[in-house]
Amino acid sequence: MPMYFEEKNSIRYGKFGCYDPFPFIRAFFSTRIGGVSRPPFDRLNLGMTTEDERNRVLENRKLFFDTIKIPQSAVVIQKQIHEDRSAYVETPEFLDCTDAAYTDRPNVFLTVSAADCVPVLFAETKKKIVGVIHAGWKGTLKNIAGHTIEKIKKQFGIDGSNITAVIGPSISEKNYEVSEELADQFNSRFIVKNGYAKPHLDLWKANVVQLKNAGVENIFVSGYCTFERQDLFFSHRGSGGKSGRMLGVIGMNY
């Protein structure tokens, strides 16, 4: 499986087998298992933009980062805005108004927040570059995954063949019904109509294609649907719009 789980201190989190051969890469994805938040944010809500009690989210973040042994002082948090803006990061900081970030520096841990939108984690294993992408339907429509990779290729003079990317837990095509108006904005190969009363959008496929078109050859899809697995993950759509958030985390130690 591209993604497997570990549990420590009652905190369950995902890891990615594709990064296991590279000990300098540290990549994780939180679940809702563990933590102190109350319904509907139970339990390990890591999202500060939710209506959850701030002190509980702060406690959850401490529990999560302590468990995966990453100091919060080394963490980069984004204020995600559903656009295609990306940022090169050299030191831990708060990023205002971005949906993608990347770094070639050790001990800088990038995060992406999600609860149905597609979280992408990636690593260029030769030049030692890591990054995250937040791709909801708006970002996907703007080709944020492709634009981010192309920006990195130009900045570092690489071709993308040594980039390994992961599509993290997010809503699957089966559960992502969209309007005809929205469906018409996407390439038809990402829209499924057969068997459904309304169109369904395949964000996994769309982001895989965008990454491939940008030269990424190694792409793994976790296969976990947040809508279907609300026992493990938060789902904005599945909860009627009131849910917690997970964090994908990637960085390097060397």
Task: Enumerate the language-model features and the residues they cover.
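Active-site microenvironment for binding and transforming phosphate-containing groups
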Residues: 1-254
